[in-house]
Amino acid sequence: MGKIVGIDLGTTNSVVAVMEGGKPTVITNAEGFRTTPSVVAYTKTGDRLVGQIAKRQAVLNPGNTFYSVKRFIGRKFDEVTEEAKQVPYKVTGTQNVRIECPALQTSFTPEEISAQVLRKLAEDASKYIGEPVTQAVITVPAYFNDSQRQATKDAGKIAGLEVLRIINEPTAASLAYGLDKKKNETILVFDLGGGTFDVSILEVGDGVFEVLSTSGDTHLGGDDFDKKLVDFFIEEFQKLENINLREDQQALQRLTEAAEKAKIELSSVTQTEITLPFLSLTPSGPKHFDTTLNRAKFEELCSTLIDRCRIPVETALKDAKLTKEDIDEVVLVGGSTRIPAVRELVQKVLDKVPKQSVNPDEVVAVGAAVQAGVLAGEVKDIVLLDVTPLSLGVETLGGVMSKIIVRNTTIPTQKSELFSTATDGQTNVEIHVLQGERGFAKDNKSLGTFRLDGIAPAPRGVPQIEVTFDIDANGILSVTAKDKGTGKEKSITITGASTLSQDEVERMVQEAEKNAAQDKENRQKIELRNQAESLINQAERQLKEFKLEPNVQAPIEQTIQQLQTALKEDNLEQVQSLCQELQNSLLEIGKQVYSKTETTTPNKNEEDVIDASFSEEK
């Protein structure tokens, strides 16, 4: 059996690693680098270029140079319309995504392009190891859906690799980080790469790696930060020269490269120069672009993206039923975590300084190599327990969603439930497979349907139909329905079981929690009413007790009447506002009372007055 390699197939860069002498080692590519750009290009003569050499010629050949392809893999065209606008090459398709290659007058699937990157990594690994590499463990973002995982496996197959395991990137990072950890730790992996964002919380220690929860955003990454800068540069150039560069593919490619370079530089310096001579040619001569960008402006331009990093962190903590105090260590993964504002956000949200001991570019591939070592038997005593991100079930009588596998269940897993017929003499059942957190089928994501025929006629409720859900270690789902009376069986493998955008996932979770949120809202309303009634009571008592000036008393009485009316009309917004107003009025009553006391009982001996500060005894 040959060596099994671990591959981090990244949006921007890819890395390959292997176990050597019981330790994971990152393999240097043919060009002498430890990371390989995930870029494929075709020249006018039909030559294929992969990696650094492809990236270098991108400015001169933007329409035939393909990068950030991971953002398109395993997706429908209507899911990637925004991402398609961010690249200079042409992305087309009716349903499935196609990438146009004018140089060859053909088009490719994203899997085919990714396969070229995988093939180069495998070839470089083969030269390093000294024997052909045919098996691999490949990483994917934790929030990749089933079709994206399947497409990644297909890319490996096209590259001539047997993909033994698909492993989540944050989980791989935890393997690399926690390989030699003996004591138990709860770690949060914050993985912000070139095109995707994941957060996973794991229990790590003594060879056991258990994922407690995962969250993410498959539409957020370093590319989006670059896009913000490119848009800014285009606007600045238009102000200076009155020229719109949005349709100039070569200029866009140069701006994209300049944006990426500026982003990287601003991680270590506070200001950088962008100089692009001959950016545009006009009848009056060439136009150059020179500008200065400081870190503060970069952070301002990217503030919405940085803020989006907060939600998955909070969601992961909530799903794991943990607070920030429960997190022992924070591990940063992905080149985009080098952005100072991102690190500051992580530190602010979790109140913890992130670990600097791992290389964010290499740690995922290192973890994949550890998993490869486990599969090859080279690494012993490692137990990896990952989870599925959303609940899975079937539609039952009344349109109800009956959950069979609940969200954040450890995988691989197999679970079965017994169901029966809804009418007398029913000889077939339709199994409608669903994904989501809501109580009714119509509110969840439909994954597919299949029919089980040949059920023996019987009164309703008598036949026993066993429905089994099976999720393998790669996260791929299959469903089987079996009539226990006749032995008839039918199954379906769900390809695309998690074809959901981050927005859909968030919506499902939010809607599932709607009842809890409604209870909280009702409780807040009751508390507000109680507060209002208490303030009215207190104000009326004080008005009776203290003799106030008419010009002070009249407005307070008016506020009390308005608040009583607002309570009757259930106008809670007005109740809140008037409560604050009445609270301020009560403070004024106190001031009036004390000022009267001071004027009616003057101090005979001012020297007897002692200035003192009092602290409340607890």
UniProtKB/Swiss-Prot annotation:
The UniProt record lists the keyword Metal-binding: no
Listed InterPro entries: ATPase_NBD (IPR043129), Chaperone_DnaK (IPR012725), Heat_shock_70_CS (IPR018181), HSP70_C_sf (IPR029048), HSP70_peptide-bd_sf (IPR029047), Hsp_70_fam (IPR013126)
Superkingdom as given in the UniProt entry: Eukaryota
SUPFAM superfamilies tied to this protein: Actin-like ATPase domain (SSF53067), Heat shock protein 70kD (HSP70), peptide-binding domain (SSF100920)
First-listed, main subcellular location of the protein, grouped into a coarse class: plastid
Coiled-coil portions: none
PROSITE patterns found in the cross-reference section: HSP70_1, HSP70_2, HSP70_3
Annotated localization: Plastid, Cyanelle
Gene3D superfamilies listed in its UniProt record: 1.20.1270.10, 3.30.420.40, Actin, Chain A, domain 4, Substrate Binding Domain Of DNAk, Chain A, domain 1
Single annotated GO MF: unfolded protein binding
Sorted UniProt keywords: ATP-binding, Chaperone, Cyanelle, Nucleotide-binding, Plastid, Stress response
A Pfam family reported for this protein in Swiss-Prot or TrEMBL: HSP70
Region of interest (Disordered), residue spans: 595-618
GO cellular component: cyanelle
Keyword Plastid among UniProt keywords: yes
Database matches in PANTHER family: HEAT SHOCK PROTEIN 70KDA (PTHR19375)
HAMAP family noted in UniProt: DnaK
Purpose: Acts as a chaperone.
UniProt family annotation: Belongs to the heat shock protein 70 family.
Protein name according to UniProt: Chaperone protein dnaK
Organism: Cyanophora paradoxa
Lineage start: Eukaryota, Glaucocystophyceae, Cyanophoraceae, Cyanophora
